[in-house]
């Protein structure tokens, strides 16, 4: 099925937001919705691109288990959309679509050394949607869509997410919801790159680990180093707050240590999520548009609130295991297990050097790990998609940067990095 070929679907954003400069204010996450009819749900598909990240709902149900979609690309050269089959989500008759957007890599609003803060493509989040079957055009994104702000009051890829449950939009995913107070979406400029379907393995939540409180500093331990985020179950009064800070190590006194990890972030929080309670019984929350590298979480409570459980949610590309190794040496078996977990922790759509400090896809690091990775996992589609970004980031002179995707930083790493294109 061919999508977006006639250019009638429009990139849309929130009315009243204008990105003037790199110092433009960080805005709450936009929430979009649209009621639409569908005569026959069979064979209906959606193509969606929400930059930087999106979460999609049809008739109140989240579509797919994917997270952190779409995977980052060189947005001024190539933009990925994702296709989902909606046959099992749609009704014959009235339906409603809901989409939440996060900043992701598209709007890296915190100053850092890799120049994404100054990326040529950087702008406020935007959305492109097309729903159709082989025989029927059903829905396109345009100014008839409704948009507002909601409980995600802040999100930053390397910072974290802030969620105020008192601002939740109860019932917004129902066709009958009254959205008359919402504004109409506005047409926004395209991000610059041409549209192409995402083919890499998606990121998903691949496991859940109960974290245990280990000391008087309210530090919780996952028992292993992971990539992902925390999910909390809390109860308390409206306005009480929980602040979650993430780290891989502890100081000798048992407090979190982010030494050497946060020094390249020049403003704002680092690996910190914040939740404000609505005061309505038991509340369960986890962030949508960020991820962290950690083993330990410091959970600080302000106000009348009690944390009943804190769980670590493992996030990585959902790569199928295709190889294994075992032997009579427990040390080597343990090393193999650590290697596999470390590899997955550093594959969130792109092969990264670390899941906390940078999250960047260093070409030299990736070319050293690719053989080990392909022995263990079916990563061919994901590497192929990433290699497309090499072409997009390459200068007319032939120069390649050390990290890809790239916002114009570090085009002089040398052969050990450049050779990743060939090996």
Where are the regions that the model predicts?
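Well-ordered alpha-helical segments within folded domains of soluble proteins
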Residues: 363-374, 383-384, 415-423
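Extracellular/oxidizing-compartment recognition motifs
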Residues: 1-356, 364-365, 379-390, 396-409
């Amino acid at each position: 099925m061919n999508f977006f070929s006639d250019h009638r679907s429009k990139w849309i954003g929130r009315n009243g937001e204008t990105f003037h400069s790199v110092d433009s204010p960080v805005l709450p996450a936009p929430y979009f919705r649209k009621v639409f009819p569908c005569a026959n749900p069979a064979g209906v598909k959606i193509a969606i691109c929400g930059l930087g990240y999106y979460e999609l709902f049809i008739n109140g149900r989240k579509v797919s288990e994917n997270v952190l979609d779409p995977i980052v690309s060189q947005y001024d050269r190539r933009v990925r959309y994702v296709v989902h089959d909606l046959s099992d989500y749609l009704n014959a008759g009235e339906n409603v679509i809901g989409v939440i957007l996060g900043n992701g890599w598209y709007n890296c609003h915190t100053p850092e050394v890799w120049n994404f803060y100054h990326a040529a493509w950087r702008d406020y989040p935007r959305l492109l949607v097309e729903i159709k079957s082989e025989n029927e055009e059903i829905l396109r994104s345009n100014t008839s869509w409704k948009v507002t702000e909601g409980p995600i009051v802040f999100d930053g890829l390397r910072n974290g997410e802030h969620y105020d449950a008192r601002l939740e939009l109860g019932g917004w995913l129902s066709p009958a919801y009254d959205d008359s107070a919402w504004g109409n979406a506005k047409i926004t400029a395209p991000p610059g790159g041409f549209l192409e379907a995402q083919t890499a393995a998606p990121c998903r939540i691949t496991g859940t680990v109960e974290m245990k409180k280990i000391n008087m500093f309210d530090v919780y331990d996952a028992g292993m180093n992971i990539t992902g985020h925390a999910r909390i179950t809390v109860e308390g009064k409206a306005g009480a707050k929980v602040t979650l800070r993430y780290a891989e190590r502890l100081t000798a006194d048992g407090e979190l240590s982010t030494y050497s990890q946060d020094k390249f972030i020049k403003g704002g929080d680092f690996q910190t999520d914040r939740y404000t309670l609505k005061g309505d019984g038991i509340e369960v929350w986890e962030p949508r548009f960020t991820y962290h590298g950690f083993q330990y979480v410091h959970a600080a409570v302000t106000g009348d609130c009690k944390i009943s459980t804190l769980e670590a949610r493992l996030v990585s590309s959902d790569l199928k295991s295709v190889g294994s190794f075992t032997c009579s040496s427990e040390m080597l078996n343990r090393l193999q297990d650590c290697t596999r977990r470390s590899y997955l922790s550093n594959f969130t759509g792109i092969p990264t050097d670390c899941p906390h400090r940078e999250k960047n896809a260093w070409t030299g690091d990736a070319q050293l790990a690719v053989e080990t990775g392909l022995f263990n996992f079916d990563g061919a589609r994901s590497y192929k998609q990433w290699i497309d970004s090499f072409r997009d980031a390459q200068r007319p002179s032939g120069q390649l940067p050390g990290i890809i995707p790239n916002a114009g930083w570090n085009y002089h790493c040398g052969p050990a990095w450049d050779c990743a294109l060939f090996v």
